[in-house]
Amino acid sequence: MPTISLGTIPMEHGLAVAGILFCLGLVGLMVRRNILFVLMSLEVMMNASALAFIVAGARWAQPDGQVMFILVISLAAAEASIGLAILLQLYRRFHTLDIDAASEMRG
């Protein structure tokens, strides 16, 4: 039985997937009015950039891509926690998750 070597994917394919994910997240960010879907679109965009860092770091065998990945994941976690806190406050005050309702907020 022959051995199958899986190797790594070409850099162009990895960057293409990252670009497609980023574009999908950008479309979701511009089209949706629900703040939960906007946060999810931001997460997809951040993960796409993290994937691009990993692919580029693997191509040149440098650990910089992995370091940037850890930074992006840390920023994504902070963004998710702050975004969900804003989402909860928006829902408690206006009983809706519509972004346009946030323009009525006064502080």
Curated annotation (Swiss-Prot):
GO function terms (MF aspect): NADH:ubiquinone reductase (non-electrogenic) activity; quinone binding
Membrane-spanning segments: 11-31, 35-55, 67-87
UniProt key word Coiled coil: no
Catalytic activity, EC: 7.1.1.-
Membrane topology: Multi-pass membrane protein
Compartment(s) of residence: Cell inner membrane
Gene3D superfamilies on file: 1.10.287.3510
Any Gene Ontology biological process: ATP synthesis coupled electron transport
Alphabetized UniProt keyword annotations: Cell inner membrane, Cell membrane, Membrane, NAD, Quinone, Translocase, Transmembrane, Transmembrane helix, Transport, Ubiquinone
Reactions catalysed: a quinone + NADH + 5 H(+)(in) = a quinol + NAD(+) + 4 H(+)(out)
The keyword Cytoplasm belongs to this UniProt entry's keyword annotation: no
A Gene Ontology term for the protein's cellular component: NADH dehydrogenase complex
UniProt cross-references to Pfam families, sorted A to Z: Oxidored_q2
Assigned protein family: Belongs to the complex I subunit 4L family.
Quaternary structure, from the entry: NDH-1 is composed of 13 different subunits. Subunits NuoA, H, J, K, L, M, N constitute the membrane sector of the complex.
PANTHER family in the record: NADH-UBIQUINONE OXIDOREDUCTASE CHAIN 4L, NADH-UBIQUINONE OXIDOREDUCTASE SUBUNIT ND4L
Function comment: NDH-1 shuttles electrons from NADH, via FMN and iron-sulfur (Fe-S) centers, to quinones in the respiratory chain. The immediate electron acceptor for the enzyme in this species is believed to be ubiquinone. Couples the redox reaction to proton translocation (for every two electrons transferred, four hydrogen ions are translocated across the cytoplasmic membrane), and thus conserves the redox energy in a proton gradient.
Identification of the protein by name: NADH-quinone oxidoreductase subunit K
Species the sequence originates in: Pseudomonas fluorescens (strain ATCC BAA-477 / NRRL B-23932 / Pf-5)
